[in-house]
A protein has these predicted regions:
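Basic, polyanion-interacting recognition surfaces, primarily
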Residues: 1-100
């Protein structure tokens, strides 16, 4: 379980349902399988510290759960829900490794 605060409430979320997390304007948005998107004031680095090894940072603004990795292209990847996310140049080989 992942415990976090969102809009003044302490919430828990099954880690296996997290598809990816995005930082936008210093706010963390966590997209899930079945819960929609939830918001927190956590940093992406703090979020990643609490996640297991199958979560990787693919870009300055994104962390993905590799269990939901559906496809890899040049400097982008596709996760569940057909969502295309950017991949940093330095992370391309890492993302490809998890895809294989």
């Amino acid at each position: 379980m992942f415990y976090f605060y969102s809009e003044g409430k302490k919430l828990r979320l099954p880690i296996k349902q997290i598809i990816y997390a995005e930082i936008l304007n210093h706010d963390l948005y966590i997209t899930t399988n079945g819960w929609g998107t939830v918001h927190s004031r956590m940093t992406l680095a703090a979020f990643l510290e609490k996640m297991p090894d199958n979560f990787i940072r693919i870009h300055h603004s994104y962390v993905i759960n590799t269990d939901y990795l559906m496809g890899v292209g040049y400097r982008e990847c596709t996760v569940a829900g057909n969502v295309v996310l950017p991949v940093a140049r330095g992370m391309q080989k890492t993302v490809e490794k998890y895809f294989m």
